[in-house]
C-alpha cells in the first residue's frame, strides 16, 4: 500500500506584504542527536515550493526541522537589517505522526517575528 501523505510549506512576507520569493529552506530529519539533511529548496514567486517537500515512500513518521534562511531573504529583498540580524535563521521543529496525512507548515515572516501553525 502506498503512502498518501506529504509535506508542504508556504511563506508570506508580512513586512513587505507579499509571498516570500526565493527564500532558502533546509529540511532535516532528526534521529536522536543526529540531524540529517533531506533536501534544500527555494520558494517560488507564490512563496511556495514547486511540489511537496516530501511525499510517497520518502514520507515517514518522525521528527523533522524546517530551517528558513530569513536573513538572506530579507537582505536580498533590500531590507536593511542590523548586524547581526535578529532572525538570521528560523528553525521549526515538528513531528509527523501519520504518514498518510498532509502536513502543511505555513510561515508568516518579518525581520523581527514569525508565526506558524499546522495548515491544511
UniProtKB/Swiss-Prot annotation:
Reactions the enzyme catalyzes: 5-hydroxyisourate + H2O = 5-hydroxy-2-oxo-4-ureido-2,5-dihydro-1H-imidazole-5-carboxylate + H(+)
For this UniProt record, give its keywords in alphabetical order, as a comma-separated list.
Hydrolase, Plasmid, Purine metabolism
Which PROSITE patterns does the record associate with it? Answer: TRANSTHYRETIN_1 (PS00768), TRANSTHYRETIN_2 (PS00769)
| Xref: SUPFAM superfamilies | Transthyretin (synonym: prealbumin) (SSF49472)
List the Pfam families: Transthyretin
InterPro entries from the entry? Hydroxyisourate_hydrolase, Thyroxine_BS, Transthyretin/HIU_hydrolase_d, Transthyretin/HIU_hydrolase_sf, Transthyretin_CS
What is its quaternary makeup?
Answer: Homotetramer.
NCBIfam families from the xrefs? hdxy_isourate
Name-wise, this protein is 5-hydroxyisourate hydrolase 2
Instruction: Give the originating organism.
Output: Rhizobium meliloti (strain 1021) (Ensifer meliloti)
